[in-house]
């Protein structure tokens, strides 16, 4: 009997020790490579570190293509736990090169699709945390001063009235711009799509190196119109800038994603970050004025401002084209 009691105590102690070790493993440095600007990463970092005591999120900011290349070049001595970006095709590239590892998030309340697009990778290598749409942002004061009409479609930006008034990020450096170009080509067809893109290009005043260089130029009035991902415009509006935004009929809604990097040095910390980002608390952080992203948990929209876009209920967004 005494032996059985001793064995039970030992098993109980081992279980407690394992749970403590699991909690400790979530703490420490969690390193993420991301294309997102500090306006997005700083609020998430603060909320995550508060939710997971002892965790320290180290943010390495690189544009999407540079981030992919960095993970390729450092795979032998990888020191990164997570990759966090908007463009789904970047995650497919990393997955194809076996630079991501599988995981099964425990978070609930997230549907399988946003519009026609799956939120998570079907093989479990990356996970949508926010929905993203692509469109046209413009500065109302600039537009009035320069007598610009309100753009509604991509073809509008090819009209003579917009000459020298449009900004875009280089698609070779920006994953979101690359996806926008892909959406136009898929939606309009190869020949018509390229004609639209080339005609718009004739009106470009600047081509920035980073995606967030475009909204910065529009917000300041340096240029009048920008081709952007939606949350750049929504966060600018929340900050009081005189800007408007429209989804052209040829556009799409796709998830922005997060993934655990293969051979992540802090796998438990990476898992904790994903669970936080997909939890109600993490999803609510996306509603903050400096972020203004579209959560993938439909229930979170109950806490959003009245005019907040909702891809799960807004018929305008539901009609946007599927993307492959």
Model region roles, listed by residue range:
Residues 94-102, 121-123, 235-247:
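Ligand-binding "clamshell"
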Residues 183-247:
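Ligand-binding pocket segment of bilobal, Venus flytrap-like solute-binding proteins
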């Amino acid at each position: 009997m005494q032996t059985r009691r001793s064995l039970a105590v030992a098993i109980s102690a081992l279980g407690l020790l394992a749970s403590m070790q699991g909690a400790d493993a979530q703490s420490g440095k969690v390193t993420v490579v991301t294309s997102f600007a500090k306006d997005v990463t700083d609020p998430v970092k603060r909320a995550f570190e508060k939710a997971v005591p002892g965790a320290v999120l180290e943010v390495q900011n690189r544009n999407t293509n540079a981030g992919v290349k960095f993970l390729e070049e450092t795979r032998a001595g990888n020191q990164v736990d997570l990759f966090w970006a908007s463009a789904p095709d970047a995650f497919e590239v990393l997955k194809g090169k076996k630079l991501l590892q599988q995981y099964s998030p425990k978070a609930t309340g997230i549907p399988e699709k946003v519009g026609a697009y799956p939120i998570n990778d079907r093989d479990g290598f990356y996970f949508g945390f926010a929905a993203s749409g692509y469109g046209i942002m413009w500065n109302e004061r600039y537009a009035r001063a320069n007598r610009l009409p309100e753009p509604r479609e991509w073809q509008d930006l090819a009209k003579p009235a917009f000459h020298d008034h449009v900004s875009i990020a280089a698609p070779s450096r920006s994953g979101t711009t690359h996806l926008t170009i892909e959406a136009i080509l898929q939606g309009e067809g190869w020949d018509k799509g390229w004609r639209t893109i080339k005609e718009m290009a004739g009106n470009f005043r600047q081509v920035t190196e980073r995606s967030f260089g475009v909204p910065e130029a529009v917000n300041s009035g340096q240029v009048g119109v920008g081709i952007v991902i939606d949350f750049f415009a929504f966060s600018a509006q929340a900050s009081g800038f005189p800007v408007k935004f429209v989804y052209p009929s040829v556009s799409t809604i796709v998830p922005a994603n997060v993934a655990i990097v293969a051979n992540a040095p802090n796998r438990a910390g990476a898992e904790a970050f994903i669970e936080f980002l997909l939890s109600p608390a993490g999803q609510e952080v996306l509603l903050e004025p400096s972020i203004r992203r579209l959560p993938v948990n439909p229930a979170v929209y109950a806490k959003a401002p009245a005019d907040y876009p909702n891809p799960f209920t807004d018929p305008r967004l539901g009609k946007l084209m599927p993307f492959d």
